[in-house]
Amino acid sequence: MQIKGRTVALFLLVVGFVLSCGSHSPNNRSDHSDARTDFTLDILGGSSIRFVAFGDTRFHDPSDTTPANASVRQAIVAAIDKERPTFVSISGDIVFDGDDASDWKVWDSESAAWREHHIPVFPVLGNHDLKGDHDTALANYFARFPRVEKNRFYSVRFGNCVLLVLDSSQDEVSGEQGEWLLRHLDLYANSLDFIFIALHHPPYTSSLDEKRYGGGHSARTREQSLARVLESRQPQMHARLIVFSGHVHNYEHHDHGGVTYFVTGGGGAHPYLIPRKPSDLYQDSGINYHYLMVDATPQRVRVTMNKLDIADGKQQWTQPDVVVIPGAAPVARQPISNRTFTQFSSELITRKYETDHAHSYRRRRAANGRPLETRLEGGGLPG
């Protein structure tokens, strides 16, 4: 009887332990937790990829012209739709108030054509996207972008490249996000040709905090630390590092330590004028509403700045800056196997998505009848 009693007690102890663990499992997390896991989406099917990078759209009531110029924003969104890019990377401040449902409804309406044409959007969290009630803002954000599965930072594999998306409301080079970033830089350093990094706050900018230029922001210490990490690693890497940021409502292009930096905050938010330095690689000190078209091949990346001016209701598009970034000198590249993909995750889920020639996410057969593959990497869904 004593042995039986001990067996029952041991059984109850094990059950209690399992239940307590289950209460903290990924599937039971709150929708608004700050927990995060790794996430990788593979877009296979071609060595040449075309995508758009831009930000600071501030979707909001078009009749309120203080936060943004709605006609500019709408024109840029329409122009991007006509381009039919593989995907769009938005570097934050998608809406004006993250917890305002009406702002997100403006996003729903004005970006509807992208969803109609199956253009995926890979977002970055900006300070305005988190404005107001934190939980409500995150819920609104994740509801619009289910593909990222509630991850605040994540990676997107495509062709010979990867896009690493960071949350600059948290430290980029320390803590969980910092460990994740360094791990991925190591993973892809010599196996891919280009590593793109997208975040909201810029590591480099000639903008100032002074408001005499209509507003602006200088670079923060946190992003300067990120730049030092990237530039210290670049000489030892085969992959070239390219960084897209926003927050400053203008366009900038900087090269430091072998890393190319773009500020692409000209998506419609009220513009900041920048007192350009002589060393700045782009010198137009005026208003620069724009989006960037990025063409990536194994040999080079071409970034074209598409600038919009509207006068008397007429749109004028120009391309005042075109940047060609060559691939690194040939070195012994290390192919990434499925084992390498899974070494930092608890599971590998493979899904089949059949796409059209633009690599969009329609579930239909490609011309050759073979589906493209989407691969998700992660150990459970973060809240």
What spans do the regions from the language model cover?
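Bacterial N-terminal signal peptides that target proteins for export
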Residues: M1-A9
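C-terminal motif of bacterial Sec signal peptides marking the signal peptidase cleavage site
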Residues: L19-S20
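N-terminal active-site segment of His-dependent metallophosphoesterases
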Residues: H24-S102, S206
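A short C-terminal boundary segment appended to hydrolase-like catalytic domains
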Residues: P26-S33, S285-L372, E377-G380
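Extended active-site neighborhood of metal-dependent phosphoesterases/phosphodiesterases
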Residues: N27-F39, I43, D64, A101-I195, ...
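Active-site glycine-centered loops adjacent to acidic/histidine catalytic or metal-binding residues
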Residues: D56, G92-D93, G126-N127, H200, ...
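Short, well-ordered beta-to-alpha junction loops that form the rim of enzyme active sites
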Residues: S168, A198-P202, G246-V248, N306-K307
